[in-house]
Amino acid sequence: MIIAIDGPAASGKGTMAKRLAAHYGLRHLDTGVIYRAVAHALLTAGLDLKDEARAAEVAMTLDPSTFDNPAFRSHEVGSAASVVSALPKVREALLAFQRQFASQPPGAVLDGRDIGTVICPDAEVKIYVVADPKIRAHRRTLEARSRGEPADEAAILADILARDERDQNRAVAPLKQAADAYLLDNSHLDIESGVRAAIDIVEAVRAGRQRV
């Protein structure tokens, strides 16, 4: 079973995907961390984030063992990843990696921006997670402060809105709800309620398939 979870930054899709994977005994891939890894490498080397050729080279030589690097979770790297992810050659370089991950038995949960529309268009379950931008900014602020990082909520909100704009309007694989995806508004749900709502969607889809 492949579960595709898409949505904008800080919508809660990552936590939801991780919990769903644990619940169903599936592997989990936060596809955003792949782009964060590329962005981090470019930032560390002092390279231009919009240098598509160099970024694609980095994308083709990623080491999955580094994906849990805490530095990838910084606000700076997240913003840089939004820029890098708009580069067509980078997305092309990472497409095979993501599809191969999803295809391994018994299945996987992938979360990102284009899982249900591009990476795994035939996923059994697709969920599109949304939340009010102000609520997303507040959550991201609390996350940053919990890590001991300074965080300006107004600046984070402005960045989230800018990222939404880039993600939704990029030429390749823009952020959008797949036609057959279930919409889950996570604005006023705590973690447990959000996960429960996602599990309910998965179970409803599975029950529907069993009846066919």
UniProtKB/Swiss-Prot annotation:
One of its GO terms (cellular component) is cytoplasm. The keyword Cytoplasm applies. The keyword ATP-binding applies. Its EC number is 2.7.4.25. It is an enzyme of class 2 (transferase). ATP binds at residues 7-15. Gene3D superfamilies: P-loop containing nucleotide triphosphate hydrolases. InterPro entries: Cytidylate_kin, Cytidylate_kinase_dom, P-loop_NTPase. One of its GO terms (molecular function) is dCMP kinase activity. Keywords: ATP-binding, Cytoplasm, Kinase, Nucleotide-binding, Transferase. It comes from the Bacteria. It is found in: Cytoplasm. CDD domains: CMPK. Coiled coil: none annotated. It catalyses: CMP + ATP = CDP + ADP; dCMP + ATP = dCDP + ADP. It holds the Pfam family Cytidylate_kin. One of its GO terms (biological process) is pyrimidine nucleotide metabolic process. Belongs to the cytidylate kinase family. Type 1 subfamily. NCBIfam families: cmk (TIGR00017). This is Cytidylate kinase.
